[in-house]
Amino acid sequence: MYYIGIDLGTSAVKLLLMDETGSIANIVSREYPIAFPHPGWSEQDPADWWAAVCDGIPALLDGFDASQVKGIGAGGQMHGLVVLDKNDAVIRPCILWNDGRTQRQVDYLNGVIGKDKLSRYTANIAFAGFTAPKLLWMRDNEPDNFARIEKIMLPKDYINYKLTGVHCTDYSDASGMLLLDVEHKCWSNEMLDICGVQESQLPKLFESWQPVGTLTAEAAQTLGLPADVVVCAGAGDNAAAAVGCGAVGGGKCNISLGTSGTVFITSNTFGVDKQNALHSFAHADGGYHFCLLYTSPSPR
């Protein structure tokens, strides 16, 4: 039996084939571009992500029996805003985690709504990279596009949608949207009201390991895989990396250095940093939370 891991990074997708013992059988990477249409902006076309996956998976399986693939799990860059219309077509390029255009919206959330309220609603305060400020930016600057939004997704969730046809996300990734009530693991009605969106526009929530569906007939044919391959909800990249490093349960520290740098400590119980210096996110191990501090490079 084989399992496929998808890591949707900022500059490339990394694909891994693993057998049932946990041994790595093959690794493939495919790059895609980042657009910087204005100073401080950072965007990608979700179609480029999917094209890279479709090109990479057949190469990953070259020399292996594709009929033995039983499951797929995706992780990836967090916070990016993917918006779909009523036909599930992408409305505009994804605004990435390292995009800096939303400072005015961040100032509104932290200053007018207030950090204390945000912390109560979501266990976090606003940062430019988070998803909610991007929604407010769209509402303020692209009202026609904002009015067309049928579904709001994160980057790896778009890949899961293309694989399964299901609009879904997991708690670890959703924690970085500033739309999730992290403590109670549900969408925050207060934040939805602030951002002017409905819960029906948001994806269904899952634990990272839970199956969300199997491959659509189209995805199975495109990728050369059986249609009964199970796809799990997956996780945000840092939560997924933490599990891979053994940072599960309480009192473990994980440091990740990539396009961004992250440091977080796992916890068995929910908590909020009263100084607002750390983020409180759901973890991919299910029900546990960790505090996250990251540094982001500035886009061009």
Which residues are covered by each model-predicted region?
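Gly/Ser/Thr-rich active-site cleft segment
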Residues: 2, 8-10, 21, 118-238
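Catalytic phosphate/nucleotide-handling subdomain of diverse soluble enzymes
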Residues: 239-293
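Conserved small/polar residues in nucleotide/adenosyl-binding loops
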Residues: 294-300
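Carbohydrate-associated surface elements
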Residues: 99
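Short beta-strand segments
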Residues: 73-76, 153-156, 234, 254-260, ...
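N-terminal glycine/serine-rich phosphate-binding loop of ATP-dependent small-molecule kinases
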Residues: 1-92, 120, 148, 220-221, ...
